[in-house]
Amino acid sequence: MNGELIWVLSLLAVAIVLFATGRVRMDAVALFVIVAFALSGTLTVPEVFSGFSDPNVVLIAALFIIGDGLVRTGVATVMGTWLVKVAGNSEIKMLVLLMLTVAGLGAFMSSTGVVAIFIPVVLSVAMRMQTSPSRLMMPLSFAGLISGMMTLVATPPNLVVNSELLREGYHGFSFFSVTPIGLVVLVLGILYMLVMRFMLKGDTQTPQREGWTRRTFRDLIREYRLTGRARRLAIRPGSPMIGQRLDDLKLRERYGANVIGVERWRRFRRVIVNVNGVSEFRARDVLLIDMSAADVDLRQFCSEQLLEPMVLRGEYFSDQALDVGMAEISLIPESELIGKSVREIGFRTRYGLNVVGLKRNGVALEGSLADEPLLLGDIILVVGNWKLIGMLAKQGRDFVALNLPEEVSEASPAHSQAPHAIFCLVLMVALMLTDEIPNPVAAIIACLLMGKFRCIDAESAYKSIHWPSIILIVGMMPFAVALQKTGGVALAVKGLMDIGGGYGPHMMLGCLFVLSAVIGLFISNTATAVLMAPIALAAAKTMGVSPYPFAMVVAMAASAAFMTPVSSPVNTLVLGPGNYSFSDFVKLGVPFTIIVMAVCVVMIPMLFPF
């Protein structure tokens, strides 16, 4: 063992210890590695910074942007809402659908992001079903990890291994090369969790969050006595409202009808359009109306204006919470609007929002509020577009936002662009499948289109990239080059050959899986893939077999981080909400990791012959 190899292995040991202790940020450790290699002269400057020019680093950054675009447009949130409706109160159905949904979404966006989105969904469902969240949180994390086995772009380790294949002059994996293995693991994972979830006792009730919690739409509806006031009315052809401006119709004065928004068909889908005083109505528009006057004859109103009552699900537009927001505001002492009524202020025209409730001295006022003077200390309930509510809250000149309901966390800043986001995702996958356009270029095209369609803006795009992950990959890549230059890879391959080389390639697959899984207990799965990929390819070359089975087993083992709560950020996320201990992950993670290893040893040679 030469001096340079001892230096590289020592540096690797230091990095692993720092990763394992968690006292130093992982990206800081990666930068330390870059500096150490550059100053020691072990690698040339181009070799040290080769990670920054790696196409897969660009691809990973682009995938962060695409994933955030799916979040901002509400695609993931809508999936969560659908999941709750379909599963009902069945724990088995919820577990199966949860794992299928998370694995499906995680195949195209960050598994950590998907799991973060579904944690509040799972907590809500657990509370409603009066079951322990621990029975669903572990399946959630397992599904997030399994999603990394569903497509080539699902997780950075897959791309790292693919990059090593390309660097060695081989063809890379196709987009769905890993999918058959992932599907089998997913099915086994669902069956495994259906049986083993009973080992996760947890608390019988969902742990309550400490301190102040936000109220919900339902709380505000009850406090301001809004029950029974909401209506959905469709404008029939020939209605006198067609082509008329809202202010000219005087609906509030004549019928006590306050138009909150309009459902309108736009590009083959129904969207909710915000309204103001100059908004004009069209045939077949569906009006979302707050009827503040209890004595108004709804039948007469519909007859005179040729309106057709429509079904309204949920209480007071709660089913439209992704588009229609609600907030409590109050006048500030310096406001010039104190003493003026809603009508005098021109509230809807000025702010694009509707005043539907007013509390004075803790008591909600009833009836029409349009001519009620607003006093200092009044709490005003406004309804309208979430974006406009946010603008009013930030304005700070006349009003201060007192309370935004819990549903604000589900609102998506670009909800109306969800079809465009899905189109961009499908286009990216299609371009990757053609093999005519490089994967990073296909991802960048999708990012540009998301920007064009306003699924995401430039500032949000840069913020969505998880730069510590990018720096970690870039900083660990020089290790692969250094181990090859100094003979470290050859030494590792010799050790593997001594252990399992005489028993054939199947045994070597098992050895590579075990080694990758063990290393993954101490460092991130991405760093594991960076270190193990060159060793796997060198082992294949030594044995005279195809490199693809060995490369694939490293990618799969890197995603099989089921054994400890620190093996992956996905596990760490559910640790608290699930009220788990370290032993919970060990007793469920170790057996399932062995199952995944068995699947890989059997299936990989079938898909990628030696």
Curated annotation (Swiss-Prot):
Keywords: Cell inner membrane, Cell membrane, Membrane, Repeat, Transmembrane, Transmembrane helix, Transport. It comes from the Bacteria. Its main location: membrane. One of its GO terms (cellular component) is plasma membrane. Coiled coil: none annotated. Signal peptide: none annotated. GO terms for molecular function: monoatomic cation transmembrane transporter activity. The keyword Signal does not apply. It comes from Escherichia coli (strain K12). This is Uncharacterized transporter YfbS. One of its GO terms (biological process) is potassium ion transport. The keyword Zinc does not apply. The chain crosses the membrane at residues 1-21, 29-49, 51-71, 78-98, 102-122, 136-156, 175-195, 373-393, 425-445, 464-484, 503-523, 543-563, 588-608. It is found in: Cell inner membrane. Residues 218-307, 314-398 form the RCK C-terminal domain.
